[in-house]
Amino acid sequence: MRIFNRSTLIEFWNKHPDAEAPLRLWFSMVEHASWAGPGDVRIMFGAADFLRDNRVVFDIKGNTYRLIAQIKYGPLYLVYIRFVGTHAEYDRIDASTI
């Protein structure tokens, strides 16, 4: 998958150093994936929540952090990082429109 907005992850882990290793792992796993549809995401990330408009919420570091990505499945294989934040920050946003 081709991932856009990696800088969002870097900015976040600079503020929350304990998030760096889990976010790097997420990035590496997604970068090497080839998701044809939501089922492929579910196989890799069983706790992911699926929203409208191909948005997916990923739990990072045991649900301490949340990451929202919008996915263009194959043949494009694109992932747009829309949000990364603490659980409290996530609770204050509309995950389906961010």
Indicate where each model-derived feature is located.
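Catalytic Cys-His active-site segments of thiol-dependent hydrolases/isopeptidases
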Residues: 81-84
